[in-house]
């Protein structure tokens, strides 16, 4: 933990949260194009269903982030962590409803249980990656797991203090 804040400041973008939201919304195009490019009507329907779910929960995710932006007064990720450090507690406690909304929206946007309707085996076989195997299928899976890691890192940064633990007095 000793050098995490130095590395994070080097990688920080001045428009932090807006940058992350913009790139997470670009994933919708990949899902639709992946379903369409397979030339299968069920994969295309699965891609449309997945993109509709991603777009609809992106709104709830953005609304939960607005509360963090209003409380911190900044869009830079390091400044949000610093504000939590100055407050002496994580934003997950005063913004517990927004934290819960963010967690539910993150599960829905990454197509995890119970929001895995784009991959409903009984209706659409396996969703938008029905016709893919080997390297193309693994590319879809890597992108989905990357989306989960990004959502988890964003949750830890915005609501759980990032690298800082306010009640721990170790070498920080």
Predicted regions span which residues?
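Selective transmembrane helix interface/packing segments
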Residues: 1-172
């Amino acid at each position: 933990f000793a050098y995490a804040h130095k590395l994070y400041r080097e990688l920080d973008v001045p428009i932090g949260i807006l940058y992350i939201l913009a790139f997470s919304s670009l994933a919708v195009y990949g899902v639709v194009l992946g379903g369409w490019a397979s030339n299968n009507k069920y994969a295309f329907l699965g891609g449309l269903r997945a993109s509709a779910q991603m777009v609809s929960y992106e709104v709830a995710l953005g609304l939960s982030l607005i509360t963090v932006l209003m409380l911190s007064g900044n869009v830079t990720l390091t400044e949000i962590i610093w504000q939590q450090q100055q407050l002496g507690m994580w934003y997950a406690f005063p913004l517990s409803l927004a934290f819960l909304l963010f967690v539910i929206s993150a599960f829905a946007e990454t197509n995890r249980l119970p929001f895995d309707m784009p991959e409903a085996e009984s209706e659409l076989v396996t969703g938008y990656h029905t016709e893919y195997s080997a390297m193309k299928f693994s590319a879809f899976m890597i992108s989905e797991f990357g989306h989960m890691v990004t959502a988890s890192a964003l949750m830890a940064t915005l609501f759980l203090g990032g690298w800082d633990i306010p009640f721990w007095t170790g070498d920080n």
